[in-house]
């Protein structure tokens, strides 16, 4: 086998192993979210819309693909949250909210140590998707561009998803109300560049709620 053919085979096998690893993690993430209300399609919707926004932002094809594939793992840390909190039908207490917030650090620990750009992106997303542009998020209170770019995208999409679907303690918002809220929070909760890309997709007639 020639050196070039060997290099190609090694690259192919590395990709196969990465895909196998990713599939296991995706199944774990799906298991974590399946305990919640209407959570089965949530990871797929987040992955699809995050990829579309990243593409609209003009990011490279590789980065777009990594975000699309890594985004469904954003809440993998929910696997470590007790059923008593995950399945609660009323608003969480302050103590329960503190426990729920640990899912980001749990998720980052699960994903830590990945050698590929994809898994490293997934780790950053898991840890930082609840950070907010003005620094009022968690776990580290990061602000602006200190928040990893992938997490800024997925954080906005995750918020959009949460608002447009029923939760035990509140009904879903309408699409129109949610889009208006996202627009109003440009430069507030969310990165203005991410919001701009999201609104362009909306104006272009893209189905923002599909998982396909």
Can you name each region flagged by the protein language model?
Residues 3-6, 10-13, 17, 24:
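Heptad-repeat alpha-helical coiled-coil signal-transmission segments
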Residues 19-212:
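Metal-dependent catalytic cores of enzymes that make or break cyclic nucleotides
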């Amino acid at each position: 086998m020639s050196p070039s053919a060997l290099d190609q085979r090694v690259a192919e096998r590395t990709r196969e192993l990465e895909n196998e690893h990713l599939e296991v993690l995706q199944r774990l993430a799906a298991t974590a979210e399946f305990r919640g209300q209407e959570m089965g399609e949530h990871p797929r919707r987040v992955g699809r819309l995050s990829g579309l926004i990243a593409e609209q932002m003009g990011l490279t094809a590789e980065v777009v693909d990594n975000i699309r594939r890594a985004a469904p793992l954003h809440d993998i840390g929910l696997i470590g949250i007790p059923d008593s909190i995950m399945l609660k039908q009323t608003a969480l207490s302050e103590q329960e909210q503190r426990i729920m917030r640990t899912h980001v650090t749990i998720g980052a620990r699960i994903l830590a140590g990945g050698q590929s750009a994809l898994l490293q992106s997934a780790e950053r997303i898991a840890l930082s998707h609840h950070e907010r542009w003005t620094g009022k998020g968690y776990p580290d209170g990061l602000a602006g561009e200190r928040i990893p770019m992938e997490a800024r995208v997925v954080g906005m999409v995750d918020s959009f998803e949460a608002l447009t679907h029923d939760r035990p303690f509140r009904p879903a918002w309408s699409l129109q109300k949610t889009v208006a809220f996202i627009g109003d929070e440009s430069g507030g909760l969310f990165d203005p560049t991410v919001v701009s890309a999201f609104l362009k997709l909306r104006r272009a007639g893209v189905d923002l709620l599909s998982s396909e």
